[in-house]
């Protein structure tokens, strides 16, 4: 099903494509970095090879003057938010859902945000990032 459409001769990746996330829901990520992740999964499928379920962690960033704002995962309004750093200009917040890390949002802390990607993909307990 990786990249498949209703037509057997058409495959889709990128902004226009909605893919089934391994936990069961459809997800459409509108960011160019997602295309590389999707291509790594889709090309073997196009060649007829078995493709294991892959977890793509949605990611985007925006440079606002001299502060890079980043988001990893799928934070939702109903998540528990743990603000672990905030000096009025730079900040780091983890989003918890059902005891696991659902996302991270940071401003001016690119290294700390990116370190959480594998934790989100693995469904790690929130304690792993709050420790």
Language-model region placement:
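A short, polar/charged loop-to-alpha-helix boundary motif
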Residues: 109-126
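A short, charged
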Residues: 127-131
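Mid-to-C-terminal Rossmann-like scaffold of FAD/NAD(P)H-dependent oxidoreductases
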Residues: 16-111
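A structural signal for the hydrophobic beta-strands that form the central parallel beta-sheet
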Residues: 12-13
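Glycine-rich loop(s) and the adjacent beta-strand/alpha-helix scaffold that form part
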Residues: 1-9
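Short acidic, gly/pro-rich beta-turn/loop elements at beta-sheet edges
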Residues: 7, 79, 114-116
